Amino acid sequence: MTSVTRSEIIDEKGPVMSKTHDHQLESSLSPVEVFAKTSASLEMNQGVSEERIHLGSSPKKGGNCDLSHQERLQSKSLHLSPQEQSASYQDRRQSWRRASMKETNRRKSLHPIHQGITELSRSISVDLAESKRLGCLLLSSFQFSIQKLEPFLRDTKGFSLESFRAKASSLSEELKHFADGLETDGTLQKCFEDSNGKASDFSLEASVAEMKEYITKFSLERQTWDQLLLHYQQEAKEILSRGSTEAKITEVKVEPMTYLGSSQNEVLNTKPDYQKILQNQSKVFDCMELVMDELQGSVKQLQAFMDESTQCFQKVSVQLGKRSMQQLDPSPARKLLKLQLQNPPAIHGSGSGSCQ
């Protein structure tokens, strides 16, 4: 009975006990007692694990199971010495503490994977290439999603199973062709290549370092330009302030009465308003424009008449020359006239010849 009461007291005051008391108990034990302690601790841990399994397997039995389990533990504790009981309850307290910590800070596990999803990867042959397996996985996952979507759409209004399956088959064919194209292009194979990725990473790092250098250079250049701009702005402000002070110093106020009585006022008042004059004479300018247009048209007509008359005179002179040449006998004068016909004379000469 004393052992039971002592064990209950230790069980109630277990969380408050310190590590120094545990160390004192372990140092006071002999090697035989230490071996007995370890065996007892193993038995108690096994009992605690059996208790957890029993509670997890039958949580609905209530207090009967707890009472029987407590009686079994008490019967075990009667066969142990006080030191062994304290050591066993210390181990039990530590195991309970670890269990409580695990229960409070336990990481939540993910939901179990659906069995059909795992069968997708198992149905693909391992002997195929990695790119081919990836394409098959894409196609099979699409077909699996179609199969899971079909029962949900059957209850909707206006759903046609035949059209849905026809569209699904056409889409699967398109996806198959697309996956084959990706395989032939080498896009799927790039997903499994590490060397190219490392090379691209190195090139990316080099380009990033180069860009950082350019950014630092541009930032320094921007700072210099900003400093130069501030310098010029300060100089411009100083120049404006100086100009305003000089204008205030050299400014001379003139009264309006003296300005109105000067000779400049008379000159400004006698200045004609040319814009008003032009507006008044706009009709005259329009008539002059019409007259000039008519004169230009008449000059063009006279020039055309002169061209036609010259052409007519040339034709008449040629005809008269042919007639006169036919009446003459072969002679040196005829040859001379032929030469003259080859070089046509001027208008006045032809007119005089025709008159003769």
Curated annotation (Swiss-Prot):
Presence of keyword Lipid metabolism: no
Subcellular location as annotated: Nucleus; Chromosome, Centromere, Kinetochore
Keywords: Cell cycle, Cell division, Centromere, Chromosome, Chromosome partition, Isopeptide bond, Kinetochore, Mitosis, Nucleus, Phosphoprotein, Ubl conjugation
One example of a Gene Ontology biological process annotation: cell division
Disordered: region residues: 1-28, 73-93
Placement of covalent cross-link Glycyl lysine isopeptide (Lys-Gly) (interchain with G-Cter in SUMO2): K253
Superkingdom assignment: Eukaryota
Biased composition (Polar residues): 75-89
Biased composition (Basic and acidic residues): 8-25
Subcellular location, principal: nucleus
InterPro entries: Dsn1/Mis13
One GO CC annotation: spindle pole
One Pfam family linked to the record: MIS13
Sites bearing Phosphoserine, chain numbering: S28, S30, S58, S77, S81, S109, S125, S331
UniProt entry tagged with the keyword Methyltransferase: no
Function: Part of the MIS12 complex which is required for normal chromosome alignment and segregation and kinetochore formation during mitosis.
Oligomer and partners: Component of the MIS12 complex composed of MIS12, DSN1, NSL1 and PMF1. Also interacts with KNL1, CBX3 and CBX5. Interacts with KNSTRN.
Protein name: Kinetochore-associated protein DSN1 homolog
Upper lineage: Eukaryota, Metazoa, Chordata, Craniata, Vertebrata
